[in-house]
């Protein structure tokens, strides 16, 4: 046809058979990528330490999505929650990956078949004998089927009625596991962090989709609406049902991922930046220590009972906003593989007063080391200019003692060591990190939470403009073609001096 490269899809405009073929090929590519990516991630994933080296630290992207839907076991004999297993069954990580690849192959073959045999009787309009699609009817079919799938997911898969349930955890990401979820039909179902809302919303949305699908199958659109919204034009479908629905969904999931929700557990995707900004895990750690002290435990005992997993969340290296958008690689490639918690440093001045290191804000690369007391008064610092210092570690006589972790009970008083741990305390809890194994460069990376958000927000914006573009094309097709819909005289096209100019010469044929 001699079309330019950016007009490739014009070929499918009036060819229902090949339109179906290209969509099948697209599905084949998506499913094939998903299965192949899963197998690649399984090949490089190390399941040995789910606490300090979880999937999100290793940069896994599709494994977390499989896990949140109920897949936890591998044919390699390991479980995502730790330990070994003997009978993972067909619905393991490898089983799901393989099923996607098989499905991709079948779609590939079907796409080829429909490309070759494009002139099918089912696509022919009985009245005209030309290929055509009843788009409102097809819309009803798709709405009905997607409603059935949506209802089935909420009523059976999520609830565990026929399925595994979904990943559910506590607010601090410590006790996560796959379990069945009861629908939340009260106001609590609108809380984005309540798993029951996932079940109830899918049941409700699925029911609505089924009813709406049946409505569109049984009721024809009015002629005025049909013409006004260009329902006979395939580009209307592209603009609305396809692009608009996808960009809206992409914006929504970018938000639920970045701000956190029950659908994006921190055990699978890592913590959010707001949990660092608000001192979310730090407050919980101090609450637990305070409870222990109230039960007459010693400081050492109280801090030793803090789960290593909780302490690890309270480390800025796990903040998805610390890694640059264009720094490739997993978190482990940045600051290294976490080996162990050194413990919590309690820092005191020579008067025995507890002082606390100010934590670095998310978007700072460097931050002055300042130590405040309980009242927010500056008691010590690491000065830029020693000649003018008043609160330097050496002058104030600061010491540090560790509670919990590997250095439990160890104390330091020499200024160089104290300053070293004060600097590290700016970044939250202190961990020993192995940077040699992966040749980690020490520069923070983002987690899959950050990558997912960036990707979906970017494509949502792109698709939004695509929606405007194709919506305008289909609504104003006659205007763009230069044909006046009210034109009653035959006109020699190309004789116009200016489109829409009533003084332009018209030549009656």
From Swiss-Prot:
Pfam families per the UniProt record, alphabetical: PSII
A GO-annotated cellular component: chloroplast thylakoid membrane
Membrane topology: Multi-pass membrane protein
Compartments reported by the entry: Plastid, Chloroplast thylakoid membrane
Predominant localisation class: plastid
Keywords: Chlorophyll, Chloroplast, Chromophore, Membrane, Photosynthesis, Photosystem II, Plastid, Thylakoid, Transmembrane, Transmembrane helix
Gene Ontology annotations of biological process type: photosynthetic electron transport in photosystem II
Gene Ontology MF term list: chlorophyll binding; electron transporter, transferring electrons within the cyclic electron transport pathway of photosynthesis activity
Family membership: Belongs to the PsbB/PsbC family. PsbB subfamily.
Function as written in the Swiss-Prot or TrEMBL entry: One of the components of the core complex of photosystem II (PSII). It binds chlorophyll and helps catalyze the primary light-induced photochemical processes of PSII. PSII is a light-driven water:plastoquinone oxidoreductase, using light energy to abstract electrons from H(2)O, generating O(2) and a proton gradient subsequently used for ATP formation.
Complexes and interactors: PSII is composed of 1 copy each of membrane proteins PsbA, PsbB, PsbC, PsbD, PsbE, PsbF, PsbH, PsbI, PsbJ, PsbK, PsbL, PsbM, PsbT, PsbX, PsbY, PsbZ, Psb30/Ycf12, at least 3 peripheral proteins of the oxygen-evolving complex and a large number of cofactors. It forms dimeric complexes.
Protein name, per record: Photosystem II CP47 reaction center protein
Species for this entry: Populus deltoides
